Swiss-Prot record:
GO terms for biological process: maturation of SSU-rRNA. GO terms for cellular component: cytosol. One of its GO terms (molecular function) is ribosomal small subunit binding. It comes from Acidothermus cellulolyticus (strain ATCC 43068 / DSM 8971 / 11B). InterPro entries: KH_dom-like_a/b (IPR015946), RbfA (IPR000238), RbfA_dom_sf (IPR023799), Ribosome-bd_factorA_CS (IPR020053). One of several proteins that assist in the late maturation steps of the functional core of the 30S ribosomal subunit. Associates with free 30S ribosomal subunits (but not with 30S subunits that are part of 70S ribosomes or polysomes). Required for efficient processing of 16S rRNA. May interact with the 5'-terminal helix region of 16S rRNA. This is Ribosome-binding factor A. Monomer. Binds 30S ribosomal subunits, but not 50S ribosomal subunits or 70S ribosomes. Residues 119-150 are annotated as: Disordered. NCBIfam families: rbfA (TIGR00082). The keyword Cytoplasm applies. Coiled coil: none annotated.
Amino acid sequence: MNDRARARKLADRIKVVVAETLERRVKDPRLGFVTITDARVTPDLREATVFYTVLGDDTALAETAAALESAKGVLRAEVGRQTQVRFTPTLTFVPDTVPRQARQIEELLARARAADREVAERAKSAQPAGEPDPYRFDGAAAADDDEPAT
């Protein structure tokens, strides 16, 4: 089996095991509303990075990070028990910044849409600076120019 495929499967299993263990066994009051979003394992299967998000402010994020650090041993033992790999990967917990960045991008897009609507409203009542159609060909003036000189 390909090492990358095995690492991907192990990462998926670690994600599930960590999420279930946090829900059922870890009873730390500092642990807020945490969601395990992703897990990645190195090709040698020795280290796993677990990404998480927390509902709340930066204080809740810091408290959850401390709770995850203190529960790291229990989580690693459970991962080893349920995955039955020769070497249980070392767990590293990293806050996932994707939801925060997505929210910022959505806010920027909303501002851009509002600015576009404002420009469209202004364009409806705008008047040209010069003639309404500067390239319009006036037929009467052209008829005088087309007559041959006698």
